[in-house]
Amino acid sequence: MAADSSRVYRRLMALEPRAQSLCAWQGKVLRNTLSAGSEPEQVQELGRLGSSYRHLCTLSGVSTDVLDECRNQYHDTAREMAFVLHKQAQRLKRLATYQLAAQVYREFLGTFEGEKASVEVAFYLAECLWQIAALSPASDTIRWSEAAEQYTRVIHLDPAGRFVKEAAYAAVLAWQNALYLDDDDLKRRPATTL
């Protein structure tokens, strides 16, 4: 039943790409996928909801109420999905689930970075990137550098915020891992800048 419903909504979206109901239709496809689809499918449909929102923003004549409703649905669903995937990844210690959570965090930040909640989301993205680096079979400089850069970004987003101390400490450790330094290396070669 959900698959049939989703097929109908997809057909409507293909026939009427400028309809004000575009986001509502994609939201229903996403809801169907959340109840019956795999995690990668859910993340894909969330991305499509984001694309629908961004597309509606470019159209003229779309009512403010429709845009606000679409924005709120996308914002809330993306944030909640990222948190759920992150918690599940922590429980299962699955690299693939951390990667999906990171993808959704990035999706959220790509649209809502300037918002108050974005600092928390940015921090949790950094946490996911740390775990991705730690769990990857071939942990390398690039993965650890991504985590370090994201922690550093959290510090810049809110220098007096609640995540600063933990982000600063984690950034130092991630850079240390990226550079393959242990404590003895640090004693022999002190860093000139941080």
What are these regions (language model features)?
Residues 1-194:
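Acidic, polar-rich low-complexity tracts and alpha-helical solenoid repeat scaffolds
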